[in-house]
Amino acid sequence: MAHTSDGWGAPYDNQTYVEAYEQLEIALLEPLDRILETANVEEFRPKFKNHQDPNDRKNKKNNDEEWRDSIYNIATDESDTDDHEQRKNFFQPPLQVQRNSFVKNTLMEFKRSSQIDISRLAVMGCGEMSLEKGICEYLGSFGTINVLSVDIDEPSLSIGQQLLGKHLERNAEILAVETGLPVLMRSYVGDILEPDHRFADVDAIVSMEVVEHIPLPNAKKFVENVLGTLMPRIFIFSTPNHEYNAVFGMEPGEFRHGDHKFEMNRKEFSNWLEELSIRFPHYQIDPPHYIGMTRGYENLSGASQAAVCRLQVDLNTTLPQEVTPYEMVGHLPCRLGSRLIAYNLVKEAFLDWLEKIELQEHEPRTDGYSPYWIFNVQNILHHLKAPVSFALTIDEKVAIKYIQGMTSRKVHAEYSHGFNGIVILQMHSKEELIKTVQDNTL
């Protein structure tokens, strides 16, 4: 299961962007190890109260509401348990959203303070990929070009792939204007207790609300594998604060979810982090961070308790490259920065076309208030200096809008002659248009 490198250069110029997109398209052609059986989104994790029973017509949501709740994580709040169907929402925004924000802010601060790009980000125990959806628009700010996600639960992973794909599609326009290189988001089926070389030496590993789902000895083994074998530059993980269950009206000793194997109180979690600091001195491990607070219960700190571990010395894994037990089952592109790239490429193509064309050699039309020329925008797009795979993503009408903007509306759109065209008034010289374009920047 050896895979080609997923990395590409830093976003210094248009050519780097274009080459990155070309490499992304090549990476997306790489065959998967296998394809997951598609899980039913409408039956997605019915144990959470906000996801209604799909057979309950009275409470059934339409597809748009279902997608909305799934995408914005309203349906996967840790405060919603099997035994408390009528419980109110304790957290605004939902606790899952707050955890995602904590990860985003922590990674942003790490990038700022270390001046190191988080080029490869791994999510271990990714579940339904709430975190990936929550931070995808910030990946450019992190300097990320590759996200690797792994989970052992295939239905959850299938749901995650569907929801992430839908999220990327719905937010394509927002992502297109974000600064950053395109991001390859790959998903794997695997047991996080088994280290995989592809997850070694990454810049960041995140594992939120995962360890409590496996027996405590295995949870400790997982964390020790990350800090001692995979050795990311930063490792963030969280688990429920057991003391906070009292806020939800739960009985002493009752776990927040039926599938939790253990839960720690604040003292137990703090002691665990102190033990890790002694065993792995090459990591600086913060005191516990707390996420999610309900008014009136400030004395309990927060619903989730998180650890942040930063590598202090430049060490590399000793895990052999052939150790790749995970199966690659999905990949999706997060097309950051594509609009800026397209704009700059169209600008270069338009300038190149203007330099080479002699407007006066073409007979102007005189059926308007001023003589003018009409040109098919395809003639301009033929001057694009980009691989065909990327050039084909630039819509002709969008290219015309770019040209209108960069010429300060001295060029007009024309769609009534059977093609997508531009109109140039004879009063505007080629030299004037070139200067206007060169003076305008996006």
Swiss-Prot record:
Any one GO MF annotation of this record = RNA binding
Recorded hits in InterPro entries, A to Z, give: Hen1 (IPR026610), SAM-dependent_MTases_sf (IPR029063)
Coarse class of the primary localization is cytoplasm
Which cofactor is recorded for it? Mg(2+)
Gene deleted: what happens?
Answer: RNAi-mediated knockdown suppresses RNAi-mediated silencing by siR-1, which are 22G-siRNAs (a class of secondary 22 nucleotide siRNAs that possess a triphosphorylated guanine residue at the 5'-end and are formed from 21U-piRNAs and 26G-siRNAs).
EC number(s) on record? 2.1.1.386
Binding positions for S-adenosyl-L-methionine per the UniProt entry: 125, 151
Q: What is the role of this chain?
A: Methyltransferase that adds a 2'-O-methyl group at the 3'-end of PIWI-interacting RNAs (piRNAs) and small interfering RNAs (siRNAs) which are classes of regulatory RNAs that are involved in gene silencing in endogenous RNA interference (RNAi) pathways. Methylation protects the 3'-end of small RNAs from tailing and trimming and could constitute a recognition signal for appropriate argonaute machineries. Methylates and stabilizes 26G-siRNAs (a class of 26 nucleotide siRNAs that possess a monophosphorylated guanine residue at the 5'-end) when they are bound by argonaute protein ergo-1.
| Similarity comment text for this entry | Belongs to the methyltransferase superfamily. HEN1 family.
Q: What is this protein called?
A: Small RNA 2'-O-methyltransferase
- Its source organism is Caenorhabditis elegans
Q: What is the lineage of its organism?
A: Eukaryota, Metazoa, Ecdysozoa, Nematoda, Chromadorea
